Amino acid sequence: MTELIDIPFLLTKDCSADLEDRLRFCIETGSLYQTHESFKKDIGEIVNTRQALVNLKFGDSKLLTKYYGYLECLLKKIDPEALAFSWSYTNYTIFEGNVFRDENLLGERRNILFNLGIAYYQSAKHIDDYKNNLPLVCDYLKRSAGCFEILSQRTKERNSEKAIISETMLKALKSMCMGLAQETVWFKSLAAKKDLLTSKLAYKCFEYFQESLNSFQLVGQSTEYIKLILVFVESKMLYFKAVCVYRLAQSIESIADNVGVVIRCLSIAVAALTNSKLESTVVFKNKCLEMLRQLEKDNDFIYLKHVPSHLQFSDFVKLYKLDSMKDLIVLPDLTEIAPSMLDQILFRNLLPIEIMDYGTSYNEKQDIYVLQHFVEPINLLNIQLDEELASFFEIDPQHIVNAHNKTKSFVTRKELDVIGQSFGDLESNAINIETQLANITSYLDLEIKTYEEDKQQYGDVWTIVDARDVTKEFYEKVEKLRQYLEIGRNINLETQELFASIDKSLVTSRTSKAHLTAQYNDPFLNKIEALKKRRERFISEIEKKSYENRIISKLIMYYKETDDIPGTISEREEIFDNIYSKHMKVFAVDMKYIEDCKNENYGLIKEIEEYKSRTNFNNEDRSSDPRTQYIQDVRQSLASLDDVKTQLKKGTAYYQQLIEKVNELVQVIVGFLEARRNDRERLLNEISTAA
């Protein structure tokens, strides 16, 4: 299609060396237990393909399509800001200073899709036998328009993809390509020799080119290329304006009765063709001019009809319904534009660190769920029972105080000793964690020192990623864990101070718990004691169940199964949420136990109320009663002791989680150091062989 104007590609620089280094760094620092050596082939493939795109030509649409697919793979695995690519926009807009600008991974994808649109356009332009290849020409132009349409939508919808090439420019190019595609449909209709149909198809071409011209005029004549394209689009619009009215004139059956209308149509056609700069308009203009002059002469001497000079082009469009033609050009979607873009999946087995981040986030969410739906409700139910039992004891103080005012509680000196030892156990855990974190720091320091010594010895040939860069994230995690450790120690100190403030003589007895139970042998108290033990066992079991049922394996499985689906990990957050919702159904059966506990509490409280009624307890003020005051002191001490127990339990769980996180970090760093050691040995062998 030789009449098409040349539209240039966006220019880019060769960045293969920098791209390879950045990809290695991204894999080392942003993936899970993996090194760049495992993806050496994939890195080479994407670097070589990118290098081949520096000098583009019209037949490179397949190469662009392949590279576009590679970028889709990268966007699912790597932070878009981690990579940089140099691009020049001087053909489309005017810049001050440096011709080339850096773009991130999203900008790279955007520009590759833009160049793909240009490549399809250029493919249509270079088809010599236009008449016999109309479907192929039309397909290329639709694909080109489809690329610009996708870019236009992304530029409009995504603030993160603010493009140098504006949405208006993209709309202008899209409308131009659609007009050219419509032209192939119009051209094919000429063989049918149906002038009115041909006129309507020509008007559709006119509409597309008019839309394109309006958009280009909004862009402005910023560069020489834009000026040339603007002239081309305007000339095409004028050409099809002329074709439209010319074919309309041809469709009028009775020339003698409508010679004035025909003359007006030809006048509009000649005026439009006079301003068109297309070479093909010369012959057509002369033909229209010759017909116009002959009809004007015949009208002056034979027909003597009025020429409606007041009628404009838009009037003919309305009178003859030239705009009634539906859109015949349907743009393809991206999979049709670039059908082979996912033929080869790069970095298929690369697991982004974000997967682990999501897993950790969901684990924390799951822990909160277990705490809020199981642990806390049961604790609240137990507190409710304790409060009711307190009033139960006030009715009959002998349940707590004997004749000699000695405490008969269910806490022994041995139990208090165990509590005291627990503080030491927690501090031992803290010391162990502190030691592990110090060891991790030492390993990282040693790795940096080793790298610096190797770099100093071997110079530029030492191409292993800088240890100072790849260990930065590990140092940050160690510091975060130290902060968590300090928080735990502060809470332990506060709890220890609370324990020290408790009057041990009020909450301990000279006899064992078993002896007290035998002495009172209160079935009601025994019943409640057994119930609390069952609830404690349930909490232990539900916490164990939660620990053994983590979501990370399900996320990894889903990710591997759907690795060929386009899009970033963050775009799958809704799917991850659905996986989490299904995962949490494992606790659905346990919710019935909470309802059973609520019903148990209701029954026990009812029993206590009935007991109160039977005792005819006098509700007069007894605050001055020494026994009542003593009971209140006991209750306060016991409540403080319960707080200590609760905090110790939480502290144990807190340190357990902290130990798990430290162990996870140790595993990651061990894998990291192992990979670094392998890379070092490999590079030393290469240097030795080269020498």
Curated annotation (Swiss-Prot):
Residues covered by the BRO1 domain: 3-385
Any GO CC annotation of this UniProt entry: endosome
InterPro entries in the cross-refs: ALIX_V_dom, BRO1_dom, BRO1_sf
Function: Required for the proteolytic cleavage of the transcription factor RIM101 in response to alkaline ambient pH. May act as a scaffold protein that recruits the calpain-like protease RIM13 via VPS32 to its substrate RIM101.
Family in the record: Belongs to the palA/RIM20 family.
PANTHER family: PCD6 INTERACTING PROTEIN-RELATED (PTHR23030), PROGRAMMED CELL DEATH 6-INTERACTING PROTEIN (PTHR23030:SF39)
Protein name according to UniProt: pH-response regulator protein palA/RIM20
Organism of this sequence: Candida glabrata (strain ATCC 2001 / BCRC 20586 / JCM 3761 / NBRC 0622 / NRRL Y-65 / CBS 138) (Yeast)
